[in-house]
Amino acid sequence: MLPTLDVSDIPAARATMKELRAGLPVPDETGISVTDVTVPGPAGAPDVTLRIYRPDEVTGPIGIYDVHGGGFILGDIDASHAGNVALARAVGAVVVTVEYRLAPEAPFPAPLEDAYAGLVWFAEHAADYGVEPARIAIHGISAGGGLCAGLALLARDRGGPAIAFQYLGVPEVDDRLTTPSMTAFTDTPIWNRPNAIVSWDSYLGEGVPGSADVSPYAAPARATDLSGLPPAYVSTMAFDPLRDEGIAYGLALLAAGVPVELHLFPGTFHGSTLIEGAAISQREITERVAVLRRALGV
């Protein structure tokens, strides 16, 4: 049974997620060295914590920079720990994940700038971990996918770091909340329209979502120039309010000349990969690994 997620009370939702995580088995870290480092944050902001996963058996000098999900308001590097252990092992890559500040306490641009600061550090220190700076992919699910899309735009416009590939899993990229799937899916598991409203109000400030002044770095669906971005993979789920914005963003990337692979998984909903035994979940997980390995040239 999947947990019900209601983010109308953000502190309560965070506490619930922490309790659920406490009941999960500890991941097997055999063959993976895990270290936390503190790196400079954005100018005038606190330092940022990165967690680095380095497999004993790597498939090449490749790296993955992970940005966790959670609607901009939930999650941390502990919540994504098991997934990143598995990702590092399966891909055979060094995985670095970032502890970014959360909204509403730290609204846009704080989470994105934290993620950018961490990416800059990883690119500058990649060789210390046996990674070629030109072979780093960014990877995020849900709000993490939205942050990765914003990160790709920011890195392009600031002249770096170079990003080899962007993996955008069920990305949260459009604050306007007007797509057919966002309008229709008001009570779907884990993520739904009411949760999306809280998410964007928290990230941008109440009354700002849907207005004319929203930055494309915050809501990449707003971007009018997607040229020059790294190749992308965009996944969407059939019964997910984020479905249509993900599809639209993938098609917009394609129209801008960006190589894109766009995938809709049938019979799925937001977070349905938590049902790990389902065949479609195994297919999605297997494809994620294959996509990243292929994109990074291994």
Describe the function of each predicted region.
Residues 234-236:
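Short beta-strand/loop motif that positions the catalytic acidic residue
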Residues 1-55, 209-210, 290-298:
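A glycine/proline-hinged amphipathic helix-loop "lid/cap" segment
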Residues 106-128, 288:
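Alpha/beta-hydrolase active-site loop
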Residues 44-48, 55-63, 226-229:
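Proline/glycine-enriched tight loop/beta-turn segments at coil->beta junctions
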Residues 153-211:
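Hydrolase active-site cap/lid region
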Residues 78-98:
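Short amphipathic alpha-helix adjacent to the substrate-entry channel of hydrolases
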Residues 140, 144, 148:
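Gly/Ala-rich beta-loop-alpha elbow adjacent to hydrolase catalytic centers
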Residues 123-138, 158:
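Gly/Ser-rich "nucleophile elbow"/oxyanion-hole loop immediately N-terminal to the catalytic nucleophile
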